[in-house]
């Protein structure tokens, strides 16, 4: 009951009784009241240190055979479980902004349409937990030995996997919408009361409760083969082969799945009031590389090092050389220089994973003080399957001057 201005904020009638805080609002226009909103301190609900369980296993073994071949084995596994991690009872209804609540709907006591800005559950309700689990596993074994020429060889295989699972509680947009319309709950006849939270049953609260359940798996397998030694001409060298396979998978529950258009825009939101969700994906790639490096002391003063790497990627190939020289001009001065090219592939996440992040926006007054509270918005972060590797050319010239045993100056 009462008379209110257009755009005037009206707080929950039981705000203070349910441990809420009255927050005066700025006037929407000269001569109009901004009203008051009901907020609450949710920061003290979070843990500075969560209750966690940690476990780890490490095994290592080395042995030598009669033929001079050595065998190495390493295994490591870790598991971290976050057991509690309490959150806010619910989050701001970002997916429900701008929807008018008609008179008599969802317990509205007003005789005209209003806009509801709030959370499904406020300060009077307990905090749901957001458990996390992070597991890492790595196994590696290899052989090494010496050839008849005196050069050494080694081969290693490494397989690793990281699995990250979490659940972040939220509210279902579709079920919350149905409950507000009076067709919620298991029976399809229950109504959510936006204006008296104590009128909502535990069963109806469970009905609208949802969340983002996500599992991310990153795995990598690498096979390395290397030969090192010195030629008859006094050239130190290393050459080898590397084969690599990596994968990146993201699994989501249905509520947290979003759909993106070709331009990266969100064409279908997740079924969550606050969290934006994202895409599921399952992607992998292979690469094979060969490389060689050689070093030669051309004279007592000049050392030359050259290297090259050719790598065949899933969709393209790259060749990257490197050459460097070091010249001892005299006992006090060394000159050096190098030239190389390099590249870096985009990650599988950049190539195939799209998600909706949350960004907090804060407005400020002319004097720099905060104006109002932080507002959250959803921001689409889209993948780009056409990303190309970064490439670079690197040139360096330098000198090392050592005038005495106590002083050394390097310039590059």
Where do the protein language model's features map onto the residues?
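Transmembrane beta-strand segments that form the barrel wall of outer-membrane beta-barrel proteins
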Residues: 302-313, 319, 325, 335-339
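Residues on the lipid-exposed face of transmembrane beta-strands in outer-membrane beta-barrel proteins
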Residues: 59-63, 141-145, 223-229, 290-296, ...
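Outer-membrane beta-barrel channels and translocator barrels
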Residues: 52, 64-68, 148-150, 232-234, ...
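Charge-patterned, long linear interaction tracts outside catalytic cores
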Residues: 144, 387-412
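Alpha-helix capping and helix-loop boundary segments enriched in small/acidic/polar residues
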Residues: 278-285, 293, 309-314, 324, ...
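Surface-exposed, low-complexity loop segments enriched in small/polar and acidic residues
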Residues: 2-52, 58, 68-287, 340-386, ...
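Solvent-exposed loop/turn segments connecting transmembrane beta-strands
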Residues: 51, 218, 284, 310-320, ...
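Glycine-rich phosphate-binding loop of nucleotide-binding enzymes
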Residues: 61-66, 306
């Amino acid at each position: 009951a009462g008379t209110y201005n257009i755009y005037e904020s009206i707080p929950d009638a039981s705000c203070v009784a349910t441990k809420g805080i009255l927050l005066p609002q700025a006037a929407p226009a000269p001569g109009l009241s901004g009203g008051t909103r009901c907020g609450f301190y949710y920061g003290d609900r979070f843990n500075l240190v969560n209750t966690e369980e940690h476990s780890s296993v490490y095994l290592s073994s080395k042995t030598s055979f009669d033929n001079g071949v050595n065998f190495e084995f390493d295994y490591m596994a870790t598991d971290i479980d976050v057991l509690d991690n309490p959150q806010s009872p619910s989050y701001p209804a970002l997916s429900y902004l701008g929807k008018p609540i008609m008179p008599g709907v969802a317990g509205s006591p007003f005789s005209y349409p209003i806009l509801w800005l709030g959370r499904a559950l406020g300060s009077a309700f307990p905090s749901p937990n957001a458990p996390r689990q992070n597991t890492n596993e790595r196994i590696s074994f290899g052989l090494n030995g010496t050839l008849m020429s005196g050069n050494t060889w080694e081969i290693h295989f490494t397989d690793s996997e990281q699995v990250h699972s979490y659940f972040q509680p939220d509210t279902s947009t579709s079920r919350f919408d149905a409950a507000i319309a009076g067709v919620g709950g298991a029976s399809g006849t229950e109504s959510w009361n936006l204006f008296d939270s104590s009128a909502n049953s535990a069963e109806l609260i469970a009905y609208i409760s949802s969340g983002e359940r996500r599992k991310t798996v990153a795995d990598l397998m690498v096979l390395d083969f290397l030969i090192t030694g010195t030629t008859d001409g006094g050239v130190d060298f290393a050459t080898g082969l590397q084969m690599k396979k990596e994968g990146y998978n993201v699994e989501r529950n249905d509520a947290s799945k979003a759909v993106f258009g070709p331009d990266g825009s969100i064409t279908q939101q997740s079924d969550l009031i606050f969290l934006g969700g994202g895409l599921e994906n399952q992607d992998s790639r292979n690469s094979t590389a060969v490389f060689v490096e050689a070093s030669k002391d051309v004279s007592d003063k000049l050392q030359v090092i050259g290297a090259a790497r050719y790598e065949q990627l899933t969709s393209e190939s790259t060749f990257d050389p490197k050459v460097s020289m070091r010249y001892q001009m005299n006992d006090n001065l060394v000159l050096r220089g190098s030239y190389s090219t390099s590249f870096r592939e985009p990650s599988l996440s950049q190539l195939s994973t799209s998600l909706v992040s949350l960004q907090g926006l804060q407005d400020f007054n002319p004097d720099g003080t905060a104006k109002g509270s932080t507002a959250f918005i959803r921001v689409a972060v889209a993948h780009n399957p056409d990303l190309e590797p970064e490439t670079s050319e690197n040139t360096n010239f330098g000198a090392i001057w050592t005038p005495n045993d106590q002083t050394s100056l390097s310039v590059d």
